[in-house]
Amino acid sequence: MQNEVQQALAAFSARYCEAWRQQRGSLPVSEEYIGISSPCIVSTHPDAVEWEPQPFTPEDSLGAVEKALDIVIQPDVHAFYASQYAGDMAARYDDVALTLLQAWSQDDFRRVQENLIGHLVTQKRLKLSPTIFIATLDSELDVISLCNLTGEVVQETLGTRKRRVLAPSLSTFLSQLTPLV
């Protein structure tokens, strides 16, 4: 049975794919995934792949991140990163344009975990409260993250205490995203 985050992520992913169908007449197409295998690939073209989200199998979690840093990560983040394989998806939340990060494959999921470990180690070194990034912004210094203490979704400037709460929960945040094609 899916939890709220998995349901909200699946619903946004469906809206994203439908927006592609309506505006471009196809499933999402990405140039950056050419030559990288994934269960998401529906068809390969000379300069891009057409893809759609697929269930995350085998079941997994961010346990490696928890073990490496001896912390407990919010269950919502496990559900976000380990419920589906998909390409990164462009979206808007209120006035904020963002790219929602996803794991493209099992290898990519391992890379995501390594990046999360690096992010959390840096935060610990700087004595910042822990966050788990879930989306990027045009500015390379700003990301959208889930606060691991409160469960709130925040826009933060990396390496600083500058944070702005966007949503009270990850499921609320995901349900209010508008796909950008």
From Swiss-Prot:
Asked whether the UniProt record includes Cell membrane among its keywords, one would answer yes
The entry's cellular-component GO terms read:
cytoplasmic side of plasma membrane
**Per UniProt, what is the membrane topology?**
Peripheral membrane protein
Q: Which top-level group of life is the source organism from?
A: Bacteria
Query: Cross-referenced Pfam families, in alphabetical order?
Result: Syd
* Keyword Manganese set for record: no
Q: Where in the cell is it found?
A: Cell inner membrane
| Keywords per UniProt | Cell inner membrane, Cell membrane, Membrane
Q: Which NCBIfam families match?
A: PRK04968.1 (NF003439)
Say what the protein does.
Answer: Interacts with the SecY protein in vivo. May bind preferentially to an uncomplexed state of SecY, thus functioning either as a chelating agent for excess SecY in the cell or as a regulatory factor that negatively controls the translocase function.
Q: Which family does it belong to?
A: Belongs to the Syd family.
Q: List the protein's name.
A: Protein Syd
Organism of provenance: Cronobacter sakazakii (strain ATCC BAA-894) (Enterobacter sakazakii)
Taxonomic path: Bacteria, Pseudomonadati, Pseudomonadota, Gammaproteobacteria, Enterobacterales
